[in-house]
Amino acid sequence: MSHHDKSERRDLSRLTKVDVIDVAAAVDADKLTDAEVFKRTYLGHGSQSSVFVFQGHSGPFRMHVHETHDEIGYVLEGTGTMTVDGVTHPVKKGDVWVIPANTPHGGRFEDAPQVLFISSPIDDPDDQDRVWID
């Protein structure tokens, strides 16, 4: 059958809705303060992944690697650059990056960034998988 034939349906019975989160409200309730270098607001953990919003101040974010997890970032607010494995890329609201484990990366934002991150496997807030390299 073609992709447009509505008589054939995929079985979605195994999918369940766990939670729907208002990201803006979660971030508004957990604002970054001037005393904090950065903040992560965790939105949830699955069996294989974590979702959180990173909030930072304008300026650099040090080069680092994650030894055990891949990282997907979606820019909610902010403009700047991301340096990934030695290559610098401009980033702005709406951009996405995918960074495999053990890939050096860091950034510089011109204004306060908010980035939605998905980490797989889980990024444990109590046992951070981040090694600073500069």
Description of each model-found segment:
Residues 1-53, 62, 132-134:
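A short, N-terminal "cap"/entry segment at the start of jelly-roll beta-barrel domains
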Residues 53, 82-84, 115-117:
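Short hydrophobic/aromatic-rich beta-strand segments that constitute the beta-sheet cores
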Residues 55-56, 65-82:
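Short, conserved beta-strand element in jelly-roll/cupin
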Residues 60, 79-81, 88, 104, ...:
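Structural motif
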Residues 76-77, 92-93, 111:
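A cytosolic small-molecule/anion-sensing beta-strand core signal
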Residues 86-101:
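Short acidic-glycine-tyrosine-enriched beta hairpin
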Residues 101-126:
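Ligand-binding loop in jelly-roll beta-barrel domains
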Residues 127-131:
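Short, charged, solvent-exposed linker or helix-capping segments at domain edges/interfaces
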